[in-house]
Amino acid sequence: MTTTGSLPAQPSSTSPRTGNPSTDRALAMLLALVREGVTDVVLCPGSRSQALALVAAELERVDGVRLHVRIDERAAGFLALGLGVESGRPAPVITTSGTAVANLHPAVLEGWHSGVPMLLLTGDRPAELRGIASNQTTRQPGMFGDRVVVVDVPAPEETDEDLSRDARLARDAYRRARDERTPVHVNVAFRDPLSVAVPDLAEAVAEAHAAADAEAAAAPAPAGPTAADVLDLPHGPRTLVVAGHAAGEAAEELARAGGWPLAAEISSGSHFGPNLVVSFRELLARPGFGDRVERVIVFGHPTLTREVPLLVGREDVEAIVVGSTGGEDYDPRHRVTAHPAAVRVVGEPADPAEARRWTGTWVQASRAILDEASAAESAPLLPSGTTPAERRDFARAELAAVRADVTRRHLVRALWQATWPHDRLVLGASRLIREADRALPGKRVRVHANRGLAGIDGTISTGLGIALASQAGSGSAAAGITRVLVGDLTLLHDVGSLLIGTGERVPRIQVIVGNDGGGTIFDGLEVANTAAPAAIDRVMFTPQRVDLASLAKAYGWTHLRAATHGELEAALTTASGAPLLIEVPLVR
């Protein structure tokens, strides 16, 4: 058994006792989590975990937590992932035993590789019922591999020592998940009888909330990196700053401080600022740009280009990777020369004019590429001093633009234009995130994506978690909307997440589906040049003809079809009481 520390337990003096070991364990653990500041719990129904479920229901009744119930554990795992991504705190996810636990694995893998805090509370049989082919029983501790922290808690006894231990384990597991930004698995054994009625928890919750508020007020500010962890960066080498997924704003701050060009992916958190180079892919391959880079400083996890790992792996380039965004360090070709926790710029450039030219050349070239691409899809502009005939021609051209079919580039631009800083944007793994990365200008908008393993699974549920977390607070994001942009296969892979049960919280959310009938991302990969078209269609493109309008109706979502520029603009600004699925037909 792996435990997470030996801090003294702080059981509540008013924590109720029922005399049932299973229920009292659930009370001790969940009230300890409320004292830690837990606000959201995700739960799937099941017999072995019923004590935890019933206590969670009582906590919801007395406003102790926001409870989110799902019938599919895979969807529940990604919902918890989304809550953790947005809030920075683990949202405990409760399941019963057996395959229920296994279905959390995709979300756990994404959480580990992305550095997202997660806390799994999984019900299990006691030791005497394991390994004897008991129903719905398998080896749950270690199911997620040796990289995920696991605590295997034996079946409870009715003693103060056991309850103190349970509270301590729950608290320590939560803190480790939160502070280390990693999944932690607490496997909890329960012995019959599995539950009794849960007492009123209003008083216990009031005390727990007061304790959480007091601890939050007394908590010291997060400690920054020590001087030994900070690498000084002198001016001199021609430098490019790269911001991969989840880099945060530190990459933009460094690029500005150093006066260096910034290649920031769309989900980096640094896709803004005066030094932003949107078209860095094209420029890395262009003579006079990529071939002149002498030093590259990487934040986050770059996943959307092949040019960046090639640059980092070059023998003539000094490669520095700052910090970590998940369980593994970014080090393509094992060429990274330094991996500091933080960096800072020191000194002044020897030739300030040359330093400005270096960055200005990148920024101006990128803008020229974007302007050229934008001109092809932009609506006409009415010049001043026009004649009546010219105005009629303009009106006809403008009407034609409104009626024009939506392309991938127009789709991502329209979505970007409709999204404000208090909104949230979630991009699924498809051609569309790459189109957004290539086409969208700088803007300080919070963009999320599951790029730890870059799978298509769980995108809708992740988006729902992000929406629920962002809209639950009192800040500006509470008034925002979450938009989730996916391809058709990404939607269908996670279609069960459209099920939001009766009585569940329904956030403001739009799921925008670029429907091109299958997996067109493979059309741009090497396989398109090596395999027969019929084989590609059969095993890679995987064509589909799902009626998305009927699908949306079955799950209680509003469906809109937006095939033209005008229809898309209207759909994105539609106010809907129900969650909204916007289908955008696209040509393969």
Curated annotation (Swiss-Prot):
Q: Which reaction does it catalyse?
A: isochorismate + 2-oxoglutarate + H(+) = 5-enolpyruvoyl-6-hydroxy-2-succinyl-cyclohex-3-ene-1-carboxylate + CO2
Q: What does this protein do?
A: Catalyzes the thiamine diphosphate-dependent decarboxylation of 2-oxoglutarate and the subsequent addition of the resulting succinic semialdehyde-thiamine pyrophosphate anion to isochorismate to yield 2-succinyl-5-enolpyruvyl-6-hydroxy-3-cyclohexene-1-carboxylate (SEPHCHC).
Q: What class of enzyme is it?
A: transferase
Q: Where is this region: Disordered?
A: 1-22
Q: Cite the NCBIfam families for this sequence.
A: menD
Q: How is the cofactor bound?
A: Binds 1 thiamine pyrophosphate per subunit.
HAMAP family in the record:
MenD
The entry's family comment says: Belongs to the TPP enzyme family. MenD subfamily.
CDD domains, sorted:
TPP_PYR_MenD (cd07037), TPP_SHCHC_synthase (cd02009)
Which pathway is this protein engaged in?
Quinol/quinone metabolism; 1,4-dihydroxy-2-naphthoate biosynthesis; 1,4-dihydroxy-2-naphthoate from chorismate: step 2/7; Quinol/quinone metabolism; menaquinone biosynthesis
E.C. numbers? 2.2.1.9
Query: In this record, what's one Pfam family?
Result: TPP_enzyme_N
Q: Which coenzyme or cofactor does it need?
A: Mg(2+); Mn(2+); thiamine diphosphate
Gene from which this protein is expressed: menD
What is its quaternary makeup?
Answer: Homodimer.
> Which InterPro entries does the UniProt record give?
MenaQ_synth_MenD, THDP-binding, Thiamin_PyroP_enz_TPP-bd_dom, TPP_enzyme_TPP-bd
Please give the biological process terms from Gene Ontology that the record holds: menaquinone biosynthetic process
Question: What keywords are annotated for this sequence in UniProt?
Answer: Magnesium, Manganese, Menaquinone biosynthesis, Metal-binding, Thiamine pyrophosphate, Transferase
Q: What is this protein called?
A: 2-succinyl-5-enolpyruvyl-6-hydroxy-3-cyclohexene-1-carboxylate synthase
What does the record give under GO molecular function? 2-succinyl-5-enolpyruvyl-6-hydroxy-3-cyclohexene-1-carboxylic-acid synthase activity; magnesium ion binding; manganese ion binding; thiamine pyrophosphate binding
